[in-house]
Design a protein with these regions (language model features):
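Ser/Thr/Pro/Gly-rich, low-complexity intrinsically disordered stalk/linker tracts of secreted
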Residues: 1-123
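Beta-strand-rich structural segments
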Residues: 126-135
């Protein structure tokens, strides 16, 4: 999850609000932790199903940056990544053993519109010494 903002489930009008639902109406709870799983997936969102089970064909839909409650959406990482992967693991027997699913969703993180340019220059150079200008 790079350097993006922490996910949250308490304030639907704030950035990074996450929600989840099932197609069966089963009750879910969400917990986000910065160090909730093993490396390299330290940041983790845990979805727990309460008072029931899922059968083949049932689904859980997770909405990152859910805007239905007024959230402006997600603050994503500051660098581009063509194949950002949402690693999905499942504890199908509810015993604390999580196994990765073979197919995981992914998105492309691309730059947005430029709002401000900043020149990055070296602070110490001699007269006539070449330097690089970075934007």
């Amino acid at each position: 999850m790079g350097d993006w903002g922490a996910l949250q489930t308490e304030h639907p009008s704030d950035y990074n609000f996450v929600s989840a639902q099932t197609n069966t109406g089963a009750r879910l709870s969400l917990t986000y932790a910065n160090t909730g799983h093993q490396r390299p997936w330290f940041k983790s969102l845990t979805v727990k199903l309460h008072g029931g089970y899922l059968s083949e064909g049932d689904t859980i839909t997770i909405i990152f940056g859910d805007r239905s409650g007024g959230s402006p959406g997600m603050k994503l990482q500051t660098f581009c990544e063509p194949g950002f992967e949402f690693k999905v693991l499942a504890d199908v027997c509810a015993v604390g053993h999580y196994f990765p699913l073979p197919e995981t969703p992914h998105i492309s993180i691309v730059p947005g519109e430029v709002h401000e340019w900043k020149a990055v220059l070296p602070s110490l150079r001699k007269i006539g010494e070449p330097f690089r200008l970075g934007l």
